[in-house]
Each structure stands twice: as structure tokens, then as C-alpha cells.
Amino acid sequence: MTKHYDYIAIGGGSGGIASINRAASYGKKCAIIEAKHLGGTCVNVGCVPKKVMFYGAQVAEAINSYAPAYGFDVEVKKFDYAKLVESRQAYIGRIHTSYNNVLAKNNVDVFNGFARFKDTKTIEVSYADGSTELVTADHILIATGGRPSIPAVKGAEYGIDSNGVFALNELPKRVAVVGAGYIAVELAGVLNSLGSETHLFVRQHAPLRNQDPLIVETLVEVLAQDGIQLHTKALPEEVVKNADGSLTLKLQDGRETTVDTLIWAIGREPATDVINLEVTGVKTNSRGQIIVDKYQNTNVPGIYAVGDIIEGGIELTPVAVAAGRRLSERLFNNKPNEHLDYNLVPTVVFSHPPIGTVGLTEPQAIEQYGEENVKVYKSSFTAMYTAVTEHRQPCRMKLVCVGKEEKIVGLHGIGFGVDEMIQGFAVAIKMGATKADFDNTVAIHPTGSEEFVTMR
């Protein structure tokens, strides 16, 4: 007999789980269909393992770059990469257990299989043993997330994608990271700090080109300072596997670099092409992203989408979580106007040092408001944690303000601890804070964050 539900999520990642748990809390009969592991990209091959690696890299930096000036004579006999991986995976395992416990507590059925639409209300679940079953629902959420893109160049298969990084059992001696986005920058920083000879290849003049120019300039400076070899205007032509197992990346302009591991981090694409979406009539764009309105509705009644798969969305875990929860509030808790505001979403890049930002860059503000209406405040200093050492690291910050009242429409920072500063400032900016509001706030000294409220 076909099982029927009030609400089904296709995809057991952060967005799907958040939305289903919220709906279940209102007494709805809910299910999740997930072909792999609960938690999706974030928990298994994204935010969580990456952040563990980031912390590992911070420990390495503390020992190698900063400990001597603080009086610690530290001798590291060896770095056990396998132990780091073991600890990381054990932590992920505990998250899986937590997810399963919460879903069970909320009486959510979990189908460990692959979902394909049969019609707008019916889903076929396929299992590893070849068996199938049908389930139906009044409401269906598509939250399948994305997957890494691989370039169409000869020998691309010799490289690994960003997911594959977390399957490595040993630290590469030499590594090439191809990509200019936050994933590429984060992976390059981690691997470099852990001890790999690291090369970062970008198509244009710098990585993270969509960030504020102050951030980009500082990042490029720090990459060089930390020993990451940045290759600009780098267009891959071919990857050659050599007799000793090493890989040579050949660029279109003739440059060549030989490494042990090559990582493709050139972007992600939506995983919407494998769920038989076409039978539903749900509209997508040319990239396969699902077109939704501000309420996460598709063009088909009863079918919704959140997360990395939607057109014009922001590919961040907390965005998917927030959108999923608000969707369930609207559908099942009598809040007909509940939806996520995608403006002023704070973001962090876990580079070395980290980057934090919310709102418009200076060029974006000038384009939107006119140069005569934009005023910028900046601060540049050496992070105190590093200032007492020989490995001094810059910390740079910017406020972008508009109008006579100097409303803050953008806040940007790169430096030690910025990743933990940005959340609180995002609340203030979301509430419409002005430069005067920041000026009227007493600074906490000595901290990096005080610079945001003392700029002149």
C-alpha cells in the first residue's frame, strides 16, 4: 500500500531537514528521502569537514608561525594527517546520529533511497538492492542541493573535485587548486597551512573578484606572504598523468605545473537532472536551477524548492535552513506571508585569515546610489595576535555608507577573528544602522572588532 504524507522532502541536507523538522513540530506527517548520508553537502563534504580542517590548519599556524614569539619551543615530531581525518569523520558520525535521533523524535520517516518523480504528487524511491516503492504527499519540497562541476578539458578525470578532498587519506606534497571562488581559496589555505606546496590557479587577475576590492587586494597580499603560489590568467588546457603518478597541469598559454594532486573547484551545478523533474512541469532555467517566487513556490502547486538549486539563490547552508523553516511556517503554521528576505545575508570565507562581509561592496554601492552619495570608511592594522611575532598579518576593514544619514549598506573585513565578528554587525545593518549608531557604541579594547566602531 502506498504511503501518504502531508510533506516530503527530496534531499536530506540542511534545508530539507530543517523544513521537515519544523513541519513535524506542528504535527504533520513527514518524510525525507536521501540517497546518501543525512546532512547533505554541508555535513559530509562541505562546511563541517572543511571547518574541522580549517581549525587543524589554525593549530598548525599557531605552532609553526606564532608559538616561538610567545615563548613556546615546540618540536613537532610529525603531523598525522590520518588522525585529523579520523577525528573529523568521528565528529561527522556524531552529527549523523543527532540528525537521526531528532528525526525519530519528530516521527519523521527516513527513506534511504533515490527519489524520482512519477507525477506531481507521487515519488518512486529506489533502493540499493534494486527494489522500489511509491510514496505520495500533499506538499513536496525539492532540496537536492548541488554537485561540483568538472571542466571539459583533456585529462580532467585525473583530478578530483572538492568533494574528493575529503576522501584523501594522506596530505599531498604538492597540490594544485583550480578555481577562484571561496571553495578554492579555503582549500588552498588549509592545505598550505598543513604543509602542502600549494598552487592556486584563477582565470582572471585574482580570486574572489566579487568581494570588495580592499578584500581582494589584501587576500592576494596574504597569499603571497603565506607561500601560496597564485597563477593568474590561468586557462587549463590539459592534465597529463606522468609515469611516477604525478600530474602536470598545462595551461593554454604554455605554462606547466607538476603536482601530486589536482583539485577542481570551479563551481557547482544543481542536482535537478536526476529526479525526473520533467514529468512535473516544474520550470527550470538553462542551468537546471528551479525557478521559484519569494515564497519558494515553483510554478506547480504543492511543489517547492530551497537551497543551492534555486535560480537567484545564495548557495549557503544557513540560507537553505532559514528558507526551509520559513516555508514550513507558511504552509503549516498559518503564517501566509512568511518568507526569507535574501537581502543583507552575511557571509564568511574561511581563508587564512578569514573574510567576513555583509551588504554591498563599494563598487556596488556606487552603481546603485551614485558616487556622490557614497562615503567609505577604512581601517588597516596588524592583528594583535600576530603583531608580537615575526609573522605579522594584516587586518583591513571597510564601512560603505550612503546618504546624508550615512546608512551603512556594506561592511567588509579580512583578518584574524573576522569570521566571529560579522554576525553581530549583520544584525545591526539589517536593522538599518547608521555610521552615527556605530560611533555611539563604546568600543571593546583591545579587539579587532573595535575598529568597526571607531573609524573616522
PLM features per residue range, with description:
Residues 2-13, 171-181:
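Beta1/beta-strand and adjacent pyrophosphate-binding region of the FAD-binding site
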Residues 2-5, 21-28, 33-171, 204-208, ...:
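Glycine-rich flavin
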Residues 8-15, 19-36, 41, 48, ...:
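Flexible, glycine-rich terminal cap/loop adjacent to redox cofactors
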Residues 8-10, 115, 134-145, 177-178, ...:
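Short hydrophobic core segments
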Residues 47, 142-197, 229, 278-280, ...:
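Glycine-rich dinucleotide-binding loop and its adjacent helix/turn
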Residues 109, 116-128, 135, 194-294, ...:
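A Rossmann-like FAD-binding core segment of flavoenzymes
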Residues 157-173, 256-334:
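FAD-site-proximal beta/loop scaffold in flavoenzymes
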Residues 306-366, 437, 445-456:
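A conserved FAD-binding loop/helix module that cradles the flavin
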